[in-house]
Every structure is written in C-alpha cells, then in structure tokens.
Amino acid sequence: MSGSIDVITHFGPDADKPEIITALENLTKLHALSVEDLYIKWEQFSNQRRQTHTDLTSKNIDEFKQFLQLQMEKRANQISSSSKVNTSTKKPVIKKSLNSSPLFGLSIPKTPTLKKRKLHGPFSLSDSKQTYNVGSEAETNEKGNSSLKLEFTPGMAEDAVGDSAPLSHAKSSDAKTPGSSTFQTPTTNTPTTSRQNVPAGEILDSLNPENIEISSGNPNVGLLSTEEPSYNQVKVEPFYDAKKYKFRTMRQNLQEASDVLDDQIESFTKIIQNHYKLSPNDFADPTIQSQSEIYAVGRIVPDSPTYDKFLNPESLSLETSRMGGVGRRVRLDLSQVNELSFFLGQIVAFKGKNANGDYFTVNSILPLPYPNSPVSTSQELQEFQANLEGSSLKVIVTCGPYFANDNFSLELLQEFIDSINNEVKPHVLIMFGPFIDITHPLIASGKLPNFPQFKTQPKTLDELFLKLFTPILKTISPHIQTVLIPSTKDAISNHAAYPQASLIRKALQLPKRNFKCMANPSSFQINEIYFGCSNVDTFKDLKEVIKGGTTSSRYRLDRVSEHILQQRRYYPIFPGSIRTRIKPKDVSTKKETNDMESKEEKVYEHISGADLDVSYLGLTEFVGGFSPDIMIIPSELQHFARVVQNVVVINPGRFIRATGNRGSYAQITVQCPDLEDGKLTLVEGEEPVYLHNVWKRARVDLIAS
C-alpha cells in the first residue's frame, strides 16, 4: 500500500489507476530503482519527446519501458567494451551499428574504428585508472567514430614512467590497428621490470631541447648559510591578494554563489561584445521564441539534472545570466555546427535563433578571444639580465605524493634534495602537495606505523609532517628559493576547499629566508616570468563533448589547455569533480535485509575532488586579465610539456608511484632576457614594452625522480 502512495505522490493523480500503479511498481523492481528515481527517468523520457508533460497511458508506459531498456543496454555495452582488449593479430570485422537512437547519450556509436597509437614500451597515462580515453569519454569525430581507448595492466598504470616516445609527441605514423600485438590483455599485476629500474636523473621527455642548453644552475648554491651572495639572482613575488583566500569554508551562501556564476557570464558578454565589435542590441534572450538571428552568451549545462557522464551534442543546454535570460535554460540544436568541443561549465558565445521556442539552433560558434600576454619594460628586463649575469634561470617543479601507499619512507625525497643541493642547483624549487595525503591508505584506515627513529611518536598528522618533512626540507640550500603550494588533499592544510589558502610557514617550522607558501591557485613572478600554478587535476576532470574530425584529431591536452586559456580560469569545469567510495558497514550494525534493501542502503563517502567553493571562484581566474608565461597544473595523467598559444604548459607528474617506484619532476631552463637577440617582441605605445616570449626562450625536461 505504501508503494502505491509513493507512486501517486511522485507521478500525480493520473497514476491513481490499478493498471498504472502495477506497471510502474513492476518497473521499479525490474530495474532496481526507487519510485523517485523512476520518476526522474520519466521526466527524461518526457523531455526527450519534447513534451513538458506526458500522459500516463498504457501506450506511453510501453514506450517508457523501451526507453529504460535502451539505457540499460547502452550502459552494459559500454562496460563490456571498456573491459576488453582485442589481442588478435587479425583485424576484426567491424559491423555498422543499426540501432543508434537519438535518446540522451544513446546516439554515441560503439564501433572502435579509430586506430590505436603504437607504444614502444609500457608507460603510465594515469596513476589511478587503467583505461585512458584520448579525448573525452564521449569524443567522436564527424563520421561517428568512438574515442580511442588504451588499456594497460595495473602494474603499468602505477609504475610506468615512460622511457619510450611519450604520447605528447606521438605521430600518426605510429598508429596501430586494434589487433596490434602491442596491446596485451591485462593478466598480471607485476610491474614491468624495466620501469622499476629507471635511474634517477634520466631525462624522460624534453621540450625544445635542440635550441637551448640546460642551465648550469645557481652559482650561490654550495655557499655556507652564513655567506651572503654578492647579488640577489632571482626575485619571487606573489601576484595575488593573499588576504582574499582567508575565507571560512563550509559557510557557502547560495545568493553569493549565484552571483559569482552570473558574473562569469556577464563578464564574458562584455569581452565578446568588445572583441567582435557588437552592440548591446545584438544580444537577446535565447530562451524566447524568435525568427531573427541573435547573439547569446551562456554556460554549457546538461539538459537533465540526473545526467550521467556520457554526454553528447544532443544532450546539452545553454544557461543564461539574469540579464541575458533571467537565468533560464534552453536546449541546444547543434546540427548546423560541424566542429565543436564543449564541457560542462564552459562559457560560450553563439549566433543563432530559437524558431520553435523549444530549441536554440546554433548557426555559428564565436571563439572566445585569448587573454593578452604579460609585458615588461626595457629597464626591468635589463635589471633581471644584470642579476643573472647573462646566465639562464633554472626552476625545478615537483608534485606529491612523496611516499608510497604502503609506508611513510621519504628516502627518495632525501636523495632528491641531496641531488638538488649538490648537482642540479636550481634557482627556484616549486613543490606541490599533497605532502601528507589524507587519502593515503594508512592514514585513511587509521593504521599509522610505529616510527622507531623518533623518541616520541607523532600524535597528529601535523606532528607527522614536522617529524618527517620539516627536517628534510630544512636541508635545502638557503640560496634556493622554495615555493610550497598545497593540495585539497593535504592533511596539514586547514583550508580544504578550492580556491585554497596557503600553508602556514611558521606552523611548519620552516625558515623564512628561502621558503614561501603560496595559495592554490596562485600567480607569482620569478624575475620577469609570470607563473600560473593550480593544484587541481583539470586535465583529468575536463570531459569534452566532441564533434568534427578536425577537432577530434587534435591532441586532447592541447584542446584542454586552450579551454583553460580561453575561459581564463584554472579550473573552468562546473560542477567540479567528486570522488566517492562506498562506506564500509560495521559488521555489528548490519541488518538482515533482502538484496533490494541492501542496495538502497549503500552509503557513499566523499574522498576527494575539486571541492569548489563557488562563492570564491573569482580567485581561480587569471590575475590581471592576462595569461601566464608558464602554466603548471599537476595531473595524474602522463607527464608532459607543451606550448599552447605561446604559453608553456607543464604537468610534472607524480614524484613517486603508489608502489614506491620513481616518478618524475620537471626541470625548466629559461634563457636570460636579451634585448639584442631578437627573441623579445617590442610593443609600441606610450611606453615601449616587450613581450616575454618565454616559449621561445624555455626548455623543459621531464626527469625521473
């Protein structure tokens, strides 16, 4: 009886018929759905039929059954296709899919017709996943080909560093067919032996190695701490207001969050208007029916609040601002567009019309302009040149975690610091967290080991940092400027939200002379070079919706980097990623329930993710309205260094693998600015200034830690 009441409560008085109630209850049992979830599916079904309300008739319920069946078959096919790798040397016969449906996400073909990249040796694309999609999970080309998937054994995924040609430099000539013997079915968890024995200091990949020599480093390193250098070679200056990051988390105001999201759309409306020389009258509300073409600016959102991760061009809507459309949403018709790359939260500008009141038909997409590049005066550049005495600048970048999953040994970090002091000798060392990872298996389980080297055992995770990390970090030469940037997974941070306040140097008992704690994200200046750093995995979290052969054939990391630059935010995705797991139940409190009830009682707990504080997302935008010279965004994906729109984009990779094997770090060499060598671009104006053109002067080496 209670089930009947739930059905009527959700579906309304039209469901108060015995045959309707019976049919809907049977569907809840058949698909293991609650009445509320079934009603949400019914709304999706109605929306797909372009109806705000669908009558509860026997005919419509039969069609609804087919809708649910198609969704179930789609997910089953995707799961099965992602868990198998074809090891046959014979190219399989590929049959055309005949049952493609325009329902939400079901129009994505499942035929893997794109060629796979050839790998000359095992390497890691992700530290946490064994399957990596080149492009988004819904990436397709204009002929409907599904995205390329590469699968590796768990050992490869954790321990590979990449001694062969990295994916960032793979060429089309290296492609292999799906039957290539390069790809083996995962059968073992044993890491590849050659990957375990990568020597420390081996260069895994390089950007621009032909034109620039590796910097000899900082000549002051090696001097006694009491000896002062004859001159200060580098200046590290923050380029943001640190006080703005000192907000209190978990106090989000819905009105403030709404204002921030609305301001993002309005600010880009002005940028589009100025860039394309449009008048305010050219912009109109895309949700209102009109036969005239208009310009519209808004945010890409899913067409259903219960969307899954498999989006496609047919399941997107445009969210307007209060001024542009009272915050309403309208579904998008992208059939007239040949090339596109969208993701959730992206601010876009369209030209089109809403002829029927249901869809906004996009006729053309207006590319967002890229931000300007930073400049310096000739006097400033000559000063930095004099400080370096004409030598190159050397910067080292590392990213945590810094110990393996089964222990707290920092032996690898100690070896690295010794190498930094005695051999590498950089001017600046940038270290990203997590330092003490709150998701570390031993910390998450509360099973901290005994530390025989300590007289007293650490009682808190803060004490654990002071006893493990602080003594090692203090051994860094005082002539090396060290920058610490936290992670939202850092146990030593009191600010576990993004944007994130900096660590407290005094609490970490680190010397003031050469240690600087920066926020996450942060922009800072090293001499004339502007660095933009963010410690949230944008490259992994950004899932694109792709259409068009030209777009899908481009390297995915280049596309994601361009999105970041165009959106002018280090994390342009909204909503942010969330990683959860099923919370284990206490055996003593388990109840005797049937299978259905036990499924409904699963409790999910939050592990990590972007953890966005929406009210303060303005702090994640590029400071000053210009792009950085060097943008560093660590990711769990394969390390890489690229030049995208004259910006050097770097992912240094993980410092250590989960199994304890060596990871990677980045070494940046930037030639000293020289007004005479032609690598700086003069910009005429009231006061002549020069573009830094760091991408012409920089070399990046990705090195085994």
Curated annotation (Swiss-Prot):
One Gene Ontology cellular component: nuclear envelope
Keyword Nucleotide-binding, does the record have it?
A: no
Q: Which positions bear Phosphoserine?
A: S126
Q: Where is the composition biased (Polar residues)?
A: 125-134
A single Pfam family, by name? Answer: DNA_pol_E_B
Which chain regions cross the lipid bilayer? none
| GO MF assignments | DNA binding
**InterPro entries according to UniProt:** DNA_pol_a/d/e_bsu, DNA_pol_alpha_bsu, DPOA2_OB
The protein's location, in the record's own words, is: Nucleus
List the keywords (alphabetical): DNA replication, Nucleus, Phosphoprotein
What's noted about post-translational modification? Phosphorylated in a cell cycle-dependent manner.
What GO biological process terms are annotated to this protein in UniProt?
Answer: DNA biosynthetic process; DNA replication initiation; telomere capping
Q: What is its main location?
A: nucleus
User: Which stretches of sequence are listed as region Disordered?
Assistant: 115-199
What is the annotated quaternary arrangement, including any partners?
Answer: DNA polymerase alpha:primase is a four subunit enzyme complex, which is assembled throughout the cell cycle, and consists of the two DNA polymerase subunits A POL1 and B POL12, and the DNA primase large PRI2 and small PRI1 subunits. Subunit B POL12 binds to subunit A POL1.
Write out the similarity annotation: Belongs to the DNA polymerase alpha subunit B family.
Query: Know the name of this protein?
Result: DNA polymerase alpha subunit B
State which gene encodes it.
POL12
